[in-house]
Curated annotation (Swiss-Prot):
EC number of this enzyme: 4.2.3.153
Keyword Coiled coil listed: no
Keyword Lyase carried by entry: yes
Role, per record: Catalyzes the formation of 4-(hydroxymethyl)-2-furancarboxaldehyde phosphate (4-HFC-P) from two molecules of glyceraldehyde-3-P (GA-3-P).
Protein name: (5-formylfuran-3-yl)methyl phosphate synthase
Entry coiled-coil feature ranges: none
InterPro entries linked: 4HFCP_synth (IPR007565), 4HFCP_synth_arc (IPR035081), RibuloseP-bd_barrel (IPR011060)
GO biological process, one term: methanofuran biosynthetic process
Keywords for the protein's UniProt record, in alphabetical order: Lyase, Schiff base
Organism of provenance: Methanococcus maripaludis (strain C6 / ATCC BAA-1332)
């Protein structure tokens, strides 16, 4: 299983790289679950990351404003991100989510056909009025995305598994694979929960808190030794 680690700055990115992460995912935790960082942080992270290692960028827990979101996606793309992650926070339906993701995909793929577009929903969408998480694979497929993802919108100590059963998560993974896409799962995932994701054939696991000191995504800092421990679990 591939490990995606989410640094907030270049110093943390180096720790993630040295720890053996597969994907370096630039985000800005104070701005939310998939908080967007600044273009220059994405650019600096891309420059610091070895050639051949993929860099991802979250572009925010986005509203239903397709034009605004598409511009943000383009900004992340030209700043050097290989993966463009869109948090479908303010989309209330399949149609709204599709509207956002179709336009994002169009903009990103115009820059580079090999760029990877990620449609991210939330396992706890019921808490924020977001689109049903089980709709995300269909949204991703119909919009021409490459990855369907789930995270958690509210970071209050509850994990992905507090909001969706392993059976529902397996259904999400299987539907995503049926459509020929990769599946990514995140959401305050603890290291001891990773084997469950492997069992349901998840392709990519995303972490920040688990790789940070004190397990704190906001106040903690990513440390390479913690990343190494997670890598070991992902690869064994």
């Amino acid at each position: 299983m591939i490990l995606l680690v989410s640094p907030k700055d270049v110093a943390e990115a180096y720790e993630a790289i040295e720890g053996g992460a597969d994907i370096i995912d630039v985000k800005n935790p104070p701005e939310g679950s998939l908080g967007a960082n600044f273009p220059w942080v994405i650019k600096e992270t891309r420059e610091a990351t070895p050639e051949g290692m993929l860099v991802s960028a979250a572009i925010g827990d986005v509203p239903y404003k397709p034009g605004t979101v598409t511009l943000a996606a383009l900004g992340a793309t030209v700043s050097g991100a290989d993966y463009i992650k869109v948090g479908l926070y303010g989309t209330r339906s399949y149609q709204e989510a599709l509207d956002v993701m179709k336009n994002v995909t169009k903009a990103v793929k115009a820059v580079g056909e090999n760029k990877i577009v990620v449609a991210a929903g939330y396992a706890d969408a019921y808490r924020v009025g977001g689109v049903d998480p089980l709709v995300i694979p269909r949204v991703a497929r119909d919009a021409g995305c490459d990855v369907a993802m789930l995270d958690t919108a509210v970071k209050d100590g509850k994990t992905l598994f507090d909001h969706m059963s392993i059976e529902l998560l397996k259904e999400f993974v299987e539907e995503t694979h049926k459509y020929g896409m990769k599946c990514a799962l995140a959401g305050s995932i603890k290291i001891e929960e990773i084997p469950m994701l492997k069992e349901i054939n998840c392709d990519i696991v995303g972490v920040r808190g688990a790789a940070c000191t004190k397990g704190d995504r906001n106040e903690g800092r990513i440390q390479k030794d913690l990343v190494k421990e997670i890598v070991k679990v992902c690869k064994e």
